[in-house]
């Protein structure tokens, strides 16, 4: 059985997917796990593969959801994306892709979308 934290995470990831689909993106995959990290959502925006990190913070005592994506997390995100692309016979060097962040506050309605977060 999932812990409450995992259930909440799954709920916010689902809300992020619905939000992005409402903006015209199409779903490719979710929760792709690699030794180096996980890709929360993989979406398609026309000809662009979009690797989406979903973050949620109900309290700002430890920083905001955006601030929680530190350098180390960014490196894991890039590494996982490169491994996923390799399975598709692509790489970060030749694929048309970007890295978007979906940041939630306390509720699914408190959402912020930052395209090209790693630009």
Swiss-Prot record:
InterPro entries xref list: Restrct_endonuc-II-like, tRNA_endonuc-like_dom_sf, UPF0102_YraN-like
GO molecular function, one term: nucleic acid binding
Family per record: Belongs to the UPF0102 family.
Protein name: UPF0102 protein CGSHiEE_03775
Organism field: Haemophilus influenzae (strain PittEE)
Lineage: Bacteria, Pseudomonadati, Pseudomonadota, Gammaproteobacteria, Pasteurellales
């Amino acid at each position: 059985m999932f812990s409450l934290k995992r259930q909440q995470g799954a709920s916010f990831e689902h809300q992020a997917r619905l939000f992005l689909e409402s903006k015209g993106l199409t779903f490719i995959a979710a929760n792709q796990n690699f030794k180096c990290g996980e890709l929360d959502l993989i979406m398609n925006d026309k000809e662009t593969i979009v690797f989406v990190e979903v973050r949620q913070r109900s309290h700002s005592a430890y920083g905001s959801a955006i601030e929680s994506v530190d350098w180390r997390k960014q490196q894991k995100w890039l590494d996982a994306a490169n491994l996923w692309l390799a399975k598709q016979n692509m790489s970060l060097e030749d694929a048309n892709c970007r890295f978007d962040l979906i940041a939630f506050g306390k509720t699914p309605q408190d959402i912020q979308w930052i395209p090209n977060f790693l630009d």
